[in-house]
């Protein structure tokens, strides 16, 4: 969950959503991260902007990496080794971005096997041999842990891969490691610090190290932006893919609920949870979406995708995707930042030049009406869904939300040094999912966000998509007061379970800002066409410089 002061109850705002071991496989050595045994110390940010040398793999796309493996310039092993070395160099040392909570100790062995398979049979597809990082709430049945950043799950390993991990392995990807996150996907406290977890410490924004990476997929966003992987996977309940994508200058896709299975993912709420691709380009995000989508008997929501999921999302990528597109401008998601509004005005003029038809304003009539019901549903589903998930982890030290609350109280110094667990406590007090209060709130969520919300707006103006700023530029990380972000447009698509794609739009004082395109259920093809057209017209992404802070003299807007 991502915090948004504009969209959730003021009394309980839900949050957004070293390593050196030498491994030698087939003569290839690399520093690999073993699982952390306990809490990571929160190191001070570097006092001055560190010098970060260029990296051979900086900004390389999946196509670039595959071309390198085809030509013999790279192998899966060499790519894995290079990314692991880079993680050691700038994630652990140097600017200490701290985005990777654990590197897969078997990554090089997996890469070696994939290289041998490529030689014998050819590549399985575009992800063959590509190192991918996944969020530390996604189960892997290997030597890595899955903890949601909590010390309560340290030492317990899942018995079975999540469907996401299974699909990545089937596609031939190298699961490089796990990324840090806002602990428990940022649903523990209304005063939380995005990007902080008891196990992983604080992830920093690579564009300005004193700024927040947003969350809860903080590490996936920061690591992708910092070129520590080919691709990453995040998860979202409300904002946790799109906000860290925006704050870290990358593309992120929050798909329609049911397009990607949630089985084996530590949950918040089954009515909103989903995994999603995070990448430096829209094309790479679409490639990853291809690999992750699919029906899973362990997640009944995926059966709804039958006949609705595309076989190949990359075929919808059109450099002229803005031409003729009718896009509604959701003005009620503006007004939280003058500089963001000015940047949006600039990019909207470019969209018009590219042939887009902007319907302005085009606001949801139900804007703000499902905030309270959303939070209520999350409280109910958190307790039920987390308890059900923990039943699959019999060797864990905790077996229920109540156990987690008690664990945190016993370990306050390490688990609650900056914020407490008021949302957990509220959730624990809730009744089963048969409660009328829950069922009424869930019905309100769906009605207000779907039929009377996004669907009604798109019907009224005959829209292909709705656009809004994804959020504000990255805020200063504040361990004392917690997050203080402003604005955010994720909630309607999140509550509806509809798709939402964010693309880099430009910079404010050197900090990236994204624009979101969202729409009806199963409209990923239309949204990808528009997002790709926007990306190709603006080319707004620029890699981070790992500065210690923003260059205030450059405050302004621009592509």
Each model region followed by its residue ranges:
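N-terminal secretory signal peptides
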Residues: 1-15
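N-terminal twin-arginine translocation
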Residues: 12-21, 30-48
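Gly/Ser-rich catalytic/binding loops embedded in alpha/beta enzyme cores
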Residues: 29-32, 46-238, 256, 280, ...
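Acyltransferase
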Residues: 80-81, 112, 162, 312, ...
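Short helix-loop capping/hinge segments that flank enzyme active sites or metal/cofactor-binding pockets
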Residues: 128-148, 314-330, 380-450, 504-512
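Flexible glycine/proline-enriched surface loops and loop-helix/loop-strand junctions
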Residues: 147-150, 204-208, 216, 266-274, ...
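Structural helix-boundary/capping segments
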Residues: 170, 174, 225-331, 345-354, ...
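Short, surface-exposed loop/helix-turn segments at secondary-structure junctions
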Residues: 304-305, 439, 461, 470-491
